[in-house]
Swiss-Prot record:
Entry protein name: Probable replicative DNA helicase
Enzyme Commission designation: 5.6.2.3, 3.1.-.-
InterPro entries: DNA_heli_DnaB-like_N_sf (IPR036185), DNA_helicase_DnaB (IPR007692), DNA_helicase_DnaB-like_C (IPR007694), DNA_helicase_N/primase_C (IPR016136), Hint_dom_C (IPR003586), Hint_dom_sf (IPR036844), Intein_C (IPR030934), P-loop_NTPase (IPR027417)
Organism: Pyropia yezoensis (Susabi-nori)
Main location: plastid
SF4 helicase domain: residues covered: 156-426, 308-566
Keywords: ATP-binding, Autocatalytic cleavage, Chloroplast, DNA replication, DNA-binding, Helicase, Hydrolase, Isomerase, Nucleotide-binding, Plastid, Primosome, Protein splicing, Repeat
Gene Ontology terms, MF aspect: ATP binding; ATP hydrolysis activity; DNA binding; DNA helicase activity
SMART domains named among the record's database cross-references: HintC (SM00305)
Lineage: superkingdom: Eukaryota
Keyword Transmembrane set for record: no
PTM annotation, UniProt: This protein undergoes a protein self splicing that involves a post-translational excision of the intervening region (intein) followed by peptide ligation.
Amino acid sequence: MLTQQSISLLKSVEKISPDFFYFTSTSLLYRAALENVNHAKTKSVRNFFINLKNEKMIQDLNELNEVFSLIEQAPLSDTISEYSAVVIDNYIKRLLLACGDSLCLISCSKQLIEQKNITSIVSQLTKAYEILDEKDTQTLATILANLLVHLDTRKKISINSSILSGFTELDSITQGFKKSDLIILAGRPSMGKTAFAINITRYVINQKRSYVILFSLEMSTEQLLRRILAQECNLNGQKIQSGQLNNDEWQYVIQKSKTLANLNLYIDDSAKISTDTIKTKVKFFKLQGKNIELIIIDYLQLLQESRQSDNRSQELSLITRSLKILAKDLSLPILALSQLNRNLETRSDKRPLLSDLRESGCISKFNYLQTSLYNQLQILFNCYYKKIEVINFSAQKQQLFLAIKCSISKTGKKTVYKIITEAGKYIQLTSNHKLLTTQGWKRCDKINQNDMIAIQIKNFEEQKNVFNSFSSLTFESIQKINVTSLQIVFDLECKPLCNFISNNFIVHNSIEQDADLVIMLYRESYYTQETRSRDFTEVIIAKHRNGPTGTFQLKFNAQIAKFSDA
């Protein structure tokens, strides 16, 4: 049972990060103490000192005496919250002093002011603001009470607080974009992703009378405005671009331009923008009192990540994770446009799949899939282009489940890694496939011999397609990792948990896991000259975390790049 003092101590610890301390030595000691509290099996002072010694933080007797001296000076647990408040207050003051120093340096410098300098200062100020605005963890009773009040309010006013797109079928399936949702809009080039986003932008601004922020990394503000004008005036985009308009058309453009000038639309066409910069700009915009309803990013692959990665696919994973965190932090839906990889061009059926969102990880044809408690099927002989049921893992419920049918498709030849555990179990898969480890999902090319890999064991009982994972999973160390050769590999698409068991390993099937909603655009006339479907675009709801998926059609006017209900 946790005492009131223990709860107070835990709350204080949660609020303080190691970098809040001024002295590096104190920061390192606090980090070691956190490791002892959060990860050690036995929480003790002895383990704390063992960690210090292992990390080479204590070299001699004098340093050991210094640590003992700090422990003797430690405040009583009933005053810990006051001391933690002092630590936080001093850290914020140091942040503000650093901002002041930076402002003085920039102001006195003879060089031209660069945007990155201002962004850095605003970022530090935002960080200070967020620390002061930190929300405490709420009890389940409080959350439920707030939820019931919210539901009762919605019932009375009968208005959906979600952001509607203006497309009847899309809104029917999704019930609108929810706050903190990350929505991915994907398609091959020229499918109309930007036009689709502009359609939604115009509708949201008209309905909500709120701001939409559009970060355009591909087009300039002028190019985007020409597209918006074409949609607004129902005029051929080429005519507007060339300026070949008759008098009536020209007067109409001027009239519509006056309307557009008052739109609550903010366009940022900065190049090489990062998720951190987007966060800073949006928060700065909100501090000005602007009511923002939606953020649009065009497009995902052109975003930069502050933490550079050796692998672009890994970097995109970091970006999507950052965008999801940002959407939750801002309590705003983020619509991110995305390209699909060109592998789908080699398929006979070019209708996009979730695995086309990025270079999908694949497994060797010689691997086996766990399809039930005792049955395994080798991909090469049993699974080619078939749909089969497989066992997958729910991290939320900590259980293994018999999944719905998993689709398998051949993706050609790729270089394959072979990972072998100390117990002799092995699996062959491509570099960007993920495996479950003690540290969560890790890509094959990021796994090393210090990692522990999740392995399925056979001493569990099957009950209604659910297995108790505490007796069915173990973690094994890695003996070696080899790069083998080019092999025929296969891609698997498993819903809803996006993973499966192969050769007893828990394998992620590389589907974009951070998005709440994935919308894909497909137009048959892009690949064929079939006139019957030229004016129609298929909209595929490929993933919907909070509801059903589905497919419907929209009319697409290529002349003015505008979508409308079919």
